[in-house]
Amino acid sequence: EDGIRDQPRSRGLGDVYKRQLYDTCQKFDNIEFLNEWYITSIVHDGKQFCGITAIETLSGSFYTIKGKALIIATGGAGRIFSYSTYALSSTPDGLDMAYRAGMALKDMEFVQFHPTGILPSGILITEGARGEGGYLLNKDGDRFMKNYAAGKMELAPRDIVSRSIMTEINEGRGFKHETGEDCMKLDLRHLGDEKIKAKLGGIREISIKFSGIDPADEPIDIRPVCHYMMGGIH
């Protein structure tokens, strides 16, 4: 539960969608997968789509592929930010390719930042950590969200929490991560080892694997990370 929902969500829904789509496509003989290919441009005659140019990354060979229709599903451009929950492949190249072909881009200024990305990787620590009662702390040990959203505290909407964290950092109340980056602390210790393992086992595993921190023993280093881009091809 967080500040903008009154019912808890299930985790891993995106992975279920991807698996179902992939499994369904595998059932059709007329769908060909070109894995590890990189599209470089859209080919058109000024009026209609004609095909694409692409590189097979394993061989470095360049190809032109004819086509009658194109669906661009390259995702957002989250990797333009230093800290992002996006996959390394989520660069703006798909958007750039469409723009160079004359397509309009829309609402590109609307970017959502998730308040709790783990340092140094930027991997997401979900709202579940705060939904179960986790605290956000500045270097003075204060639950600083009381100064920005006293009614919701850590369960305030993402944009409010993200801005609050950056305000604390910019005003000198942040921690210094070993990488030199400024951050805040997400403290789960008061929840107890048993609850953390039962309710937040996935978060604990991520924290141990990617930061070397067991949240049952010490707070997690976090900062806002690019999480979602509302804009795209119009």
Regions found by a protein language model. Give the residues of each.
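Single conserved hydrophobic/aromatic residue that forms the stacking wall/gate
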Residues: 1-17
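N-terminal Rossmann-like dinucleotide/flavin-binding domain of flavoprotein oxidoreductases
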Residues: 14-31
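A conserved beta-strand/loop element that lines the FAD pocket in flavoprotein oxidoreductases
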Residues: 28-39, 105-108
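A glycine-rich dinucleotide-binding beta-alpha-beta segment and adjacent secondary-structure elements
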Residues: 33-35, 40-49, 53-55, 202-234
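Core beta-strand elements of the Rossmann-like FAD/NAD(P) dinucleotide-binding domain
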Residues: 60-69
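Extended, hydrophobic alpha-helical segments in both membrane/secreted and soluble proteins
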Residues: 70, 90-97, 234
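Flavin (primarily FAD) binding-site architecture
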Residues: 74-84
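An anion/pyrophosphate-binding glycine-rich loop and adjacent beta-alpha core
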Residues: 97, 103-227
